[in-house]
């Protein structure tokens, strides 16, 4: 019978004719007959012949201008590009990756996931082998740790290059110095990396061991036994106590709660902080004792494992009853792993374990984000490698290719290898850690958490900011503001009138019920005693408030009084309902706001379980209602409903509420709903339409029969259930329209203004309706009051999108507002053109956006503009957008921590993003740019000195400095001053916040570009040449004097260059300068005996008598001054003649 339920609603002939007429207008071809597609609220699109519509759009009925660049044949250009050029650049990578992936898939041979039959308490009856219920987050094991870490390091070309260079020192013919000269820096980098990986791996092992070793009670024929979480199998009956983690995916069989339901916390699974109500299988809940689970013959048929945590299809069957009992299972009957039991004790049968659980299947490794600064440094490093090879070839060429020239070439590669600094990555990683620490310690943005420490510089390069609305720009704290009944509207200042109407209605009902028990219902009697006008308004208010307080998924929770117990008690009908200790639990803040409002006007929800609700009237009377059916809210239906029976009158009523777009076709004809929805949305209110329908007992029984059959179907269950429910959703009586306000967060307006002045374009992506999104955009000053707004009209086909894009193209300097459906059509046919037009707008608002669309918009901006994007949100629907962006920011809000946990940076309020970007982002980028260039300068200058030295001595491949000189130069002699640049800042934080225009300069990338790189190369060549030639000219009698003079001048030059670059001194910078100088001076004395005199090494120039003379000091000073003074003069003149922006502000 269930399979006979129609899957799709029948389309009217008029609708089909209108659709054909529309298609005929937009193309010369006739309408294409085809199968109907299930879409109740979307206009159908004849996609087949739309694909045939030419881009030139020259058919009759279209306007085509010469300036219309939408008509460019871009497809042909892209097709030509995918030729030999594509294969040489990227095609071979794609082909190799595809082949490797194919081979890996063949080797792994993943087991196909299938549906399963699980017998209660009988794991041995499982037909197939299921994975162990163990959690493993470790990347390596004991045997693969060292090979794995080494592979991760040496898969990068530069690290592999340093390994080859270091290994070459084992070849006698290529050896040019001590082994530790090359192996010490490489070993240090590897040691730091392996230590960090080992610590992280050990922490993962400890966490996995702790989770896998948790003990649970397993129910067996002989009683309860303790079992580890990792030993749980499919079919086991597991008992989970309150506040205990659920170890695997289970079907909920029994609970200690009388209501047959329990609450669970899912914040670790979906990030939502609201408790979820779960319902036990009625057949097993009704068993007298726990041990009776083994006295019945029952099984669960479960669908194959899948990722969707919000849906489940299955059946429960008891075979030993007559007739057999069949119950449908849905998401409300499941207990997913990694959730927490919040009330009572639950018993469930395990259906999925290990990697087949929903939590594990939804755990994916997010993409490894690489910052733009790292990519730029990689490009510069590749340029340095080319310079290294070119310089070595030049030296060999000038040498005349004498002897074994290839050996000399390799030796020159070794001598000049310091051009590519191996310490660059270590310095930058340590700098990123410092930036993250500064962000988290900033008292002006408390609660900030840095979860991805590799991309702090991205915060200083952003061009596009994509933000959610609810909970991000707004507080997600809902306040009931407006009730509209069609003819009268009640606002915040007239709520006392509603309260008076409700109180009068129930007092008259009570008096009439006590005075006369025959005739009409109490409500009708109450109405008949009132004047005609008053009766109509009072009746409508009463029905509206009653519908609001009955149609929801809210559960009142009563906390026991202090000093008794900490257990949470749930209200029962016969207990004393206290307003003091009652709180409401629901999956949406809107629901709670509505129920709290009904409480404020006198009608209070005091109790709710699976089958009943109790309401308390203003006089204290308790009204009972039986819940017959509940239809929860889904993102597809955009509405929820409930069927209840009034126990005092036995009347059955179907209540429903939802979004206006979903409810408009359902309710009876009216002339005010659409207009008032628009009015409320323009005020920034979130609207819900409330309706009802009275049912007879026969109508309900017929519906229940069809609904039960649909729920038992294992194929297309959701479609069949929707079809049955839709048969009930016809000609419903419109009761009221509610408006709930979500207030803006603190300082949203100045923050958005600051971001706009910083050159950041802001796009708001929200799932809310167009009017509400537009109103919030105006009230938050996302769109200034002087700017025009172009509302992209609804389009459903390629032709309509073409015409609307042409109309939009003629607009200038106006904000764009577009719905998700229109956006989908535009991206399908005119992706490049739409993005190009949208990027020219000062602001863009996308409403009715799905999470997938949000992520796609981020990806499109990255692909089409090449600029850095940032996404910020607070809910689970923002996670995909946050992970797709170059920089993701999560806000810990009312909707939980899922967005915060998935983001790269976590903040507590939207206004904190201003300081995060203007101060920390800007400083991080400028500091890393200076640090990277200084580290490269440090390698370039010593390589220049080596080149000069070799050229002077007949291009001999002999090292100028050896041993500890090279190691000390890259570490203790210069590392601290150079690294102290991470504390430098050009302007004070207050100045950066006051003048956000300073941020705009960073998007051009001038702090680290090929121009600045070439300037530093020229500086290095100049200084290296001066230091080396100066030492050669001024040395006296021995060669060791050349080494002593040049190396000492080199160290002083590096220290002075750091001092000349610093713009704001920090006391740690001063300490670093003097510490490095002190280390160098002290090493002259302590290492004198360690190196032999007479060798070209560190000890060779330790002629104490020479280095303590005035001659040595003035020669070193002269060379240092000549190498640094001209640069200082040029810098001074530049700041006077063409000062940068920060200098103008500082002055």
From Swiss-Prot:
Pfam families xrefs: Cation_ATPase, E1-E2_ATPase, Hydrolase, PhoLip_ATPase_C, PhoLip_ATPase_N
Bilayer topology: Multi-pass membrane protein
InterPro entries, per database record: ATPase_P-typ_cyto_dom_N, ATPase_P-typ_P_site, ATPase_P-typ_TM_dom_sf, ATPase_P-typ_transduc_dom_A_sf, HAD-like_sf, HAD_sf, P-type_ATPase_IV, P-type_ATPase_N
Alphabetical keyword list: ATP-binding, Golgi apparatus, Lipid transport, Magnesium, Membrane, Metal-binding, Nucleotide-binding, Translocase, Transmembrane, Transmembrane helix, Transport
Cytoplasmic side: 1-146, 197-380, 432-930, 983-1012, 1062-1067, 1131-1147
Principal location class: Golgi
Catalysed reactions, semicolon-separated: ATP + H2O + phospholipidSide 1 = ADP + phosphate + phospholipidSide 2
Transmembrane segments: 147-168, 174-196, 381-401, 410-431, 931-951, 964-982, 1013-1031, 1039-1061, 1068-1088, 1106-1130
Gene Ontology, cellular component aspect: endosome; perinuclear region of cytoplasm; plasma membrane; trans-Golgi network
Start and end residues of each stretch annotated as Disordered: 503-535
Cofactor(s) listed: Mg(2+)
Active-site residues, Swiss-Prot/TrEMBL: 468
Protein family according to the UniProt entry: Belongs to the cation transport ATPase (P-type) (TC 3.A.3) family. Type IV subfamily.
Protein name from the UniProt record: Probable phospholipid-transporting ATPase IIB
Organism: Homo sapiens
